[in-house]
C-alpha cells in the first residue's frame, strides 16, 4: 500500500510541475504539450535516475506498470458509463463517412505497423539479442495507447516473452511525444496555408494551459444523490468499483474458453471492464435509475484517469531493463512514426468531406497516442468544434472492431500457436482487405485539400 501511495504522490508532484512548466516555458506553450506528457518525461528521468544511483524511494517501475493496467480498465469503464453525445450540428451521413474512413485507416495502421515492426526487428534486432516478436508490440502502443500496450504486453509476458509490457510502454511513451512533436507543426502549417477553415485565434488560456478566475466557466454538474446520504462523486466511483469486480468475474468466465483464446481474453481486463459497464448501465436503464449517472461528472473522471495514465505509463519505463534494446526500439518507433504520418496524411485528404484536414490531424494524433491526443490536435484548428471531427473520433471506435482478426493473429503468434511467418502473411492479407474496404466504401477518393498556399 505504501508503495502505491508513494507512486501516486510522485506522479501527482510530476503533474503539478508539468502544469507549471507548460505555463512558463514558451516552447511547451507553443507546442501545446499536455502537462501529463511533460510530467511523464520528468517522471521517467527521475525514476531511472533513482534506480541508477540505487536510491530507495519506496516504489518502482513495476508498481507504475500495475497502476497503468488498473487505470486503463477504470478509464474504459468510465467511458462506457458515460452517455452518448447529442451533437446535432453535422449531418449523420457526414459523421458516418468520417468515422468509417478514419476507423478503417486506423485498422490499416493496426495491421501495417506490426508487420513493419517485425521486419525492422528481424533485420536489426539480432545484434541486440531482441526477438522479432517484440516488434509486433508497437500497434498496441501507437494506435491504442499506453493502457493497451501494458495490457497486451502483460499477456505476451504470460506466454514467456519477458519485459514485453515494458517494451510496449516505451513505444507508447515515444508515440505520445511524436503525436505532438509532428502533429502541432502540421496543424500550424495547415493554418498558415489556409487549409484550416474553422480556425480562430488560439487564445492565451489554451497556450498556458490554465484559466484565470475571470476566464473560468461553470459546468452544469448536477447532484444525483443527496449529499447528506452519499456524495454524487462517491456514487460514481462506487459504480466504477462495482463494474471492476464484475469485470473480474467476466474474466473468470473468459478463461474457460479453449486454447490461447481463454488466457488472452481473460487477460484483456479493459474489454471485460467495457462489457461490465455496458451490462450495469443496461440494468440501470431497465430499472429506470440511470438518471443517477451524471455524464459531465463521469467524463471528468475519465479525464482524470487519462492524465494519470499517461504520467504513470512514462514512469513505468525502466531503462535498466530495456536499455540493451533501446536502439532497435527507437529506430522502429521513428520509422513507424514516418509511416503513420504518410498513411494518415495520404488517406486523410481523400475521405471526401469538408473537414478532411481536421480528420487527418485527429487520426494522426489518435494513431500515435490516444483519442484525447487526437482531439487535442483537432482543437488547434477547430477550437470551437464547429466540425463533427471530435464526434467522429469517438464513433470510429465501433469501426475499430474490424481489427479483431489482427489482434487474434498477434496473440496466437505470442502464444506460439502460429509462427511469425504465418502471422506476417495474415497481416499482409489484412492490409489488402482494409484497402479494398476503403475503396468500396468510397472513403478513398480524390484529395479534398492541398498543402499549396491559397
Give the residues covered by each predicted segment.
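Structural signature of hydrophobic alpha-helical transmembrane segments
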Residues: 1-13, 62-75, 134-139, 264-276, ...
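Intrinsically disordered, low-complexity non-transmembrane regions of multi-pass membrane transporters
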Residues: 1, 189-234, 285-291, 443-454
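Transmembrane helical segments that form the transport core of multi-pass membrane transport proteins
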Residues: 239-351
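Entry/N-cap segments of selected transmembrane alpha helices
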Residues: 65-66, 86-118, 175, 236-240, ...
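Hydrophobic transmembrane alpha-helices of secondary-active transporters
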Residues: 14, 41-48, 62-95, 274-284, ...
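Alpha-helical membrane segments and immediately flanking helix-loop junctions
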Residues: 120, 127-163, 186, 203-208, ...
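Juxtamembrane helix-boundary/capping and inter-helix hinge elements in multi-pass membrane proteins
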Residues: 30, 83-98, 125-132, 154-166, ...
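C-terminal transmembrane helix pair
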Residues: 309-312, 317-319, 329, 333-443
Amino acid at each position: 500500500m505504501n508503495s502505491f501511495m508513494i507512486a501516486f504522490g510522485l506522479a501527482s508532484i510530476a503533474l503539478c510541475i508539468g502544469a507549471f512548466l507548460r505555463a512558463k516555458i514558451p516552447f511547451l506553450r507553443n507546442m501545446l504539450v499536455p502537462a501529463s506528457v511533460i510530467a511523464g518525461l520528468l517522471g521517467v528521468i527521475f525514476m531511472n535516475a533513482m534506480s541508477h544511483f540505487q536510491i530507495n524511494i519506496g516504489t518502482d517501475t513495476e508498481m507504475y506498470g500495475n497502476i497503468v493496467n488498473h487505470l486503463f480498465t477504470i478509464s474504459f469503464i468510465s467511458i462506457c458509463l458515460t452517455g452518448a453525445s447529442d451533437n446535432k450540428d453535422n449531418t449523420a451521413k457526414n459523421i458516418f463517412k468520417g468515422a468509417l474512413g478514419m476507423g478503417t485507416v486506423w485498422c490499416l495502421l493496426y495491421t501495417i505497423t506490426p508487420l513493419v515492426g517485425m521486419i525492422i526487428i528481424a533485420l536489426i534486432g539480432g545484434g541486440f539479442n531482441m526477438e522479432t516478436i517484440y516488434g509486433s508490440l508497437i500497434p498496441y502502443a501507437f494506435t491504442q495507447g499506453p493502457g493497451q500496450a501494458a495490457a497486451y504486453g502483460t499477456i505476451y509476458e504470460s506466454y514467456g516473452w519477458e519485459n514485453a509490457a515494458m517494451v510496449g510502454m516505451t513505444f507508447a511513451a515515444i508515440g505520445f511525444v511524436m503525436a505532438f512533436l509532428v502533429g502541432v507543426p502540421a496543424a500550424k502549417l495547415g493554418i498558415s496555408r489556409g487549409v484550416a477553415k474553422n480556425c480562430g485565434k488560439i487564445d492565451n488560456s489554451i497556450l498556458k494551459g490554465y484559466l484565470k478566475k475571470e476566464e473560468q466557466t461553470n459546468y452544469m454538474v448536477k447532484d444525483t444523490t443527496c449529499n447528506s446520504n452519499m456524495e454524487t462523486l462517491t456514487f460514481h466511483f462506487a459504480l466504477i468499483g462495482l463494474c471492476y469486480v464484475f469485470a473480474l468475474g467476466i474474466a473468470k468466465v473468459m478463461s474457460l474458453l479453449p486454447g490461447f483464446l481463454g488466457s488472452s481474453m481473460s487477460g484483456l481486463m479493459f474489454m471485460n471492464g467495457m462489457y461490465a459497464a455496458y451490462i450495469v448501465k443496461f440494468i440501470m436503464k431497465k430499472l429506470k435509475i440511470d438518471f443517477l449517472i451524471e455524464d459531465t461528472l463521469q467524463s471528468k473522471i475519465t479525464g482524470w484517469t487519462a492524465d494519470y495514465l499517461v504520467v504513470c505509463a512514462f514512469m513505468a519505463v525502466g531503462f535498466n531493463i530495456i536499455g540493451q534494446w533501446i536502439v532497435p526500439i527507437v529506430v522502429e518507433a521513428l520509422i513507424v512514426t514516418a509511416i503513420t504520418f504518410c498513411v494518415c496524411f495520404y488517406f486523410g485528404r481523400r475521405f471526401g468531406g469538408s473537414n478532411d484536414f481536421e480528420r487527418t490531424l485527429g487520426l494522426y494524433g489518435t494513431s500515435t497516442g490516444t483519442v484525447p491526443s487526437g482531439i487535442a490536435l483537432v482543437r488547434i484548428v477547430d477550437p470551437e468544434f464547429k466540425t463533427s471531427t471530435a464526434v467522429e473520433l469517438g464513433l470510429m471506435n465501433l469501426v475499430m472492431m474490424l481489427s479483431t482478426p489482427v489482434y487474434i493473429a498477434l496473440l496466437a503468434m505470442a502464444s506460439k500457436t502460429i509462427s511469425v511467418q504465418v502471422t506476417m502473411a495474415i497481416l499482409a492479407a489484412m492490409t489488402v482487405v482494409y484497402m479494398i474496404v476503403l475503396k468500396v466504401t468510397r472513403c478513398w477518393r480524390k484529395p479534398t485539400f492541398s498543402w499549396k498556399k491559397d
